[in-house]
């Protein structure tokens, strides 16, 4: 469908001024008459562009501190008027057709994100005229182009040049979709904000406000269609949040390899989020969303070597994440040793990419460096509903630990305990992690009873010939019985770190004392389902 409409008159009114001067100059150079409002009009005039203020065009001034600017029949009639059908009535009322509307909206999200933002501040940043023009233009996309993203400016000028100043219906329809997505996201933000403010509005505590709105509106953008979902009979796609501020699998750039699968993305997310927990050079190997090997060291090469030794069998076909740049030596070690689905790191050297390119099926992602973790929400779909909670960003410091056993942990035991506690947070419950000298030596994941996770971790260590004696054990939740401690003692664990909080804590602590095990309570649980 290539029905073209020439662009002879455009209305520009933007809060985000990025690229607007160059775009307006390009339109004007192509003979497009410019209408504009407020700050946008002043900016264009300062740059010497011929621009007509909307208030001059309508004969009606802006009023109420700018609350009323474009809500006028000469504006909306010019946008909504159907060419060839409403021409006579437009002429009768001196309404000129407006062929393009360039609008982005008041920065509501940025306003409410500011510390100390009041309800009054938020209200004044709710755009009224902008969304109205956007929706009007999108509704009449058969005749009008609506532009809400500055990233479209260049493509629009190129198409106008290729079509003698016109845009095709296909383009106008695509722009209309973006416009409706834009206003839907905008209204969702406002609804979420107001919904979360209900307790505070009614005089309840500030802590009750700002948490979970009574209606949750979510907006995600499709990044890619998948060949299939978790299983081949399921269809799937990958959607991402807009303006993600933290390095993530959603923002990562794939620099090599074939398209990511549904399971690749899920596992890569698990690996990356785990490796972010460490400051030292670290490697995390994940299989089926569970870490199967984790280590920190003085280099990522040594960290990889030690993580791999935890469970070479499970590492086959796994996902590998690093918190440092992927170098050639480490890339060569991986490619020479194992089959890997995905490697993700903040960056990769050219030499490393040349090495991984030798294996066409290896996907390499770079995600950039990360700093502080960004609070957000986690979701779990249930039939007919959605469970929503804060991201689990909790982590205890050494100063917050409580030693509850008779024996104090040694410095090395304490380091190992904190290390495997970080890992346990990312293992499916019931989770047990054995670690020694900053590497995992056995991981028991996803068992229905905690004691069996402990037994499996010991079996895995024995299968790989790893020395458990003198190791630390982490449990993501409390031990309901002493049997888990007895199982750990049987294979030589000398230090246990766990949340505590069981009604049988005394019994569990007594078991640790019987075996000469140092026991540390974190008072923080990390269930992961």
From Swiss-Prot:
A GO term for molecular function: IMP cyclohydrolase activity
GO cellular component, as recorded: cytosol
Record-linked InterPro entries: AICAR_Tfase_dup_dom_sf, Cytidine_deaminase-like, MGS-like_dom, MGS-like_dom_sf, PurH-like
Catalysed reaction equations from the record: (6R)-10-formyltetrahydrofolate + 5-amino-1-(5-phospho-beta-D-ribosyl)imidazole-4-carboxamide = 5-formamido-1-(5-phospho-D-ribosyl)imidazole-4-carboxamide + (6S)-5,6,7,8-tetrahydrofolate; IMP + H2O = 5-formamido-1-(5-phospho-D-ribosyl)imidazole-4-carboxamide
UniProt keyword terms in alphabetical order: Hydrolase, Multifunctional enzyme, Purine biosynthesis, Transferase
Annotated EC: 2.1.2.3, 3.5.4.10
Entry protein name: Bifunctional purine biosynthesis protein PurH
